[in-house]
Amino acid sequence: MNTEATHEENAPHTTGERLRLAREQLGLSQQVVAERLCLKVSTVRDIEEDKAPADLASTFLRGYIRSYARLVHVPEEELLPMLAKQAPVRTAQVAPMQTYALGKSRKKRDGWLMSFTWLVLFVVVGLTGAWWWQNHKAQQEEISTMADQSSAELSQNAANSPQSVPLNTDNTADASQDQATPPADLPSGDTQNTASNNPQPTPVPSSNTASQQPVVVPPSQANTDTAAQQNTTQPAQSQLPVGQASTAPAADANALVMNFTADCWLEVTDATGKKLFSGLQRKDTNLNLSGQAPYRLKIGAPSAVQIQYQGKPVDLSRFIRTNQVARLTLNAEQSVTQ
């Protein structure tokens, strides 16, 4: 009876004492236990002194005590009553889940996003419209300036050009009248044959015609001379078209042909700096220019003109797409440069 009471008094009352006694019976130190359990020595000391660290949750503390008990061969059933007193399991208080209006917040966020998107879109459209209007206004001002310059140049050229003086045609009329009058001494029949068979003589000044005296020719000699002149005149007349064809000028290889489908302001300058044309060209008209290549062109409305250079059309589509004043150079190799 006394032995059982003594045994109960000597029995440890806490988990820390029970684990410390078991460790000492195995001859282990706190350092060895800490190394085997991968814990700090201070944590092992707190467990043996029944201290619960403030920064350590009860769940972790119960796990450390169970690991310590397995290491020193102490049954867990022996430690459970003491463990329940030392590190009671705290029931987690689960707070009721608050319901959030996710749909409303999402709609609100989407509304802000859409508003920002529309704002950016309006800004981009406004900037694009302002840029286009500035370019259009600048082009119109440039076209009006060029038209004013061309009008001033045309008026200045008209003021500086000399007035045309009519030619005196009295001497020519007298000469033609003298040549048309036949000599009075010739017979009428021979005169008609001579006038019909002989080629028309080259006109000479009226003073020489008036000073010459008519020559009387016998009828037989007049007929002979007329036949001879007729025979010699026919080969010369047959060779005349060949000579005219051989002397016809060749077409200009640098010819510039422009057809206008609407009113268009135009300025064309050749390689020497000479302005071949500068002014307003009306609808349904064409313009043929010739000069020294390359040509420098400035066209106010590229969509209103069709250009052919060296017999080939010139592409103006890039200027038509951007709706801007066309500035280009046509060189001898049929290439277009801006």
Swiss-Prot record:
Residue numbers on the Cytoplasmic membrane side: 1-111
Under the heading PROSITE patterns, the entry gives: HTH_CROC1 (PS50943)
User: What residues does the HTH cro/C1-type domain cover?
Assistant: 19-71
Is Cell membrane set as a keyword in this record?
Answer: yes
Subcellular location per UniProt equals: Cell inner membrane
GO process terms (BP): regulation of cell shape
Q: Which PANTHER family match?
A: CYTOSKELETON PROTEIN RODZ (PTHR34475:SF1), PTHR34475
Quote the protein name from its UniProt record.
Answer: Cytoskeleton protein RodZ
Recall the taxonomic lineage recorded for the source organism.
Bacteria, Pseudomonadati, Pseudomonadota, Gammaproteobacteria, Enterobacterales
Q: What gene does the UniProt entry assign to this protein?
A: rodZ
